[in-house]
Amino acid sequence: MGKNVVVLGTQWGDEGKGKIVDLLTEHAAAVVRYQGGHNAGHTLVIDGEKTVLHLIPSGVLREGVQCLIGNGVVVAPDALLREITKLEEKGVPVRERLRISPSCPLILSFHVALDQAREKARGELKIGTTGRGIGPAYEDKVARRGLRVGDLLNMPRFEDKLRELVDYHNFMLVGYYKEPAIEFEKTLAECKEYAELLKPLMLDVTAELHDLRRAGKDIMFEGAQGSLLDIDHGTYPYVTSSNTTAGGVATGSGVGPMFLDYILGITKAYTTRVGSGPFPTELFDEVGAHLAKQGHEFGATTGRARRCGWFDAVILRRAIDVNSISGICFTKLDVLDGLETINICVGYKDADGNDVAPTDADSYVGLQPVYEEVPGWTESTVGAKTLEELPANARAYIKRVEALIGAPIDIISTGPDRNETIVLRHPFA
């Protein structure tokens, strides 16, 4: 029988999921996206060549791997088609292997306009969204007024529903936010073009996944963003609009939790965050600048600089519990090379010195991290392929993190290329 493996982020996103998905797809018949949209930015480096993917699953660069976009993903047709074109220009036969669930909600121009108008209106209180229409598209889905990919197949009905949606959202755009109205005819013309291009890619993804499962094929489920951005379990309201935790796999693909065999949590050896929201271990000194520079910490989707800080074992333990993590992949260990000492957050205290376990953004206010200091290392870890090649202090750091989080570190990434990896236990084994 084949195995179903989930790869997801355990922090605030940007943990290095794309590289690991690409590495593990050597064993997979299919890779599935199950939540989020083109707000994701998954960077792959193969033989020194960098590719950034936003909507298309990271298995696309592996010959013969089927790439599926499940019903939980919100699809911006213009962004998807641009991504397909870029890959085809590199010689990747995307349309042969990419299939999209007709149940995926569509992101259209008014969703983007609303997203950006809201962030503009919030001013300094903005959440820090990518401004790509993700949240408004999920809102339409939950309110049962949204248009889906499959609606493009019935254009007369689509036109009626689109007119209602444009009128509905223009009421807010013009009347409340004082922004320009979205043109119905222009939007309709764009959608007619999308319909012709997307029709050959539509497939009942849930049925396909169960066919693959029954045939004994290995399947990988690729998460976007990170567990602490989950709409339910993240640092609300500074979160994304989908379930980034393992529960989102079942709802976003139609494959139930009993069929998930291994959940791999991708975890940076330090911590980063993009945009607003609590970040207890954030560094504002030269160490923070070192992490940002060595880790090239700029968002693959937005280009925004990421906030950097020490590794936080408290938030990791929460992510491990919420996701039922089987094993951890520790990424960007090489970024810590050259640091004399390294801090690990092992708890938080409030103003009165009490131990606190925060559950939402407000409960982080005024908390101070409690650190355990461990020795760093001066030797390079870049490109190490066995545990024995790592400096003794790097191995000790990994062991200490394992003990603090209560989960095994099964994979260690020592560089951006797919071959710069130490695999201690393979998820598909």
Curated annotation (Swiss-Prot):
GO molecular function, one term: magnesium ion binding
Residues annotated to bind substrate: 300-306
Main location as per UniProt: cytoplasm
Binding-site residues, Mg(2+): 14, 41
Disulphide-bridged cysteine pairs: none
Keyword match Ligase: yes
Record-listed IMP binding positions: 14-17, 39-42, 130, 144, 225, 240, 304
Catalytic residues, chain numbering: 14, 42
Cofactor: Mg(2+)
InterPro entries: Adenylosuccin_syn_GTP-bd, Adenylosuccin_syn_Lys_AS, Adenylosuccinate_synth_dom1, Adenylosuccinate_synth_dom2, Adenylosuccinate_synth_dom3, Adenylosuccinate_synthetase, P-loop_NTPase
Assigned keywords, A-Z: Cytoplasm, GTP-binding, Ligase, Magnesium, Metal-binding, Nucleotide-binding, Purine biosynthesis
Amino-acid positions noted as binding GTP in the UniProt annotation, renumbered to this chain: 13-19, 41-43, 306, 332-334, 413-415
The enzyme's E.C. designation: 6.3.4.4
Location in or out of the cell: Cytoplasm
A cellular component annotation (GO) from this entry: cytoplasm
BP-aspect Gene Ontology terms: 'de novo' AMP biosynthetic process; IMP metabolic process
Domain of life: Bacteria
CDD domains: AdSS (cd03108)
The UniProt record lists the keyword Membrane: no
Cofactor binding note from Swiss-Prot or TrEMBL: Binds 1 Mg(2+) ion per subunit.
Catalytic reactions of this protein: IMP + L-aspartate + GTP = N(6)-(1,2-dicarboxyethyl)-AMP + GDP + phosphate + 2 H(+)
Record's subunit section: Homodimer.
Protein function: Plays an important role in the de novo pathway of purine nucleotide biosynthesis. Catalyzes the first committed step in the biosynthesis of AMP from IMP.
Family in the record: Belongs to the adenylosuccinate synthetase family.
Name under which the protein is recorded: Adenylosuccinate synthetase
Protein source organism: Pseudomonas fluorescens (strain SBW25)
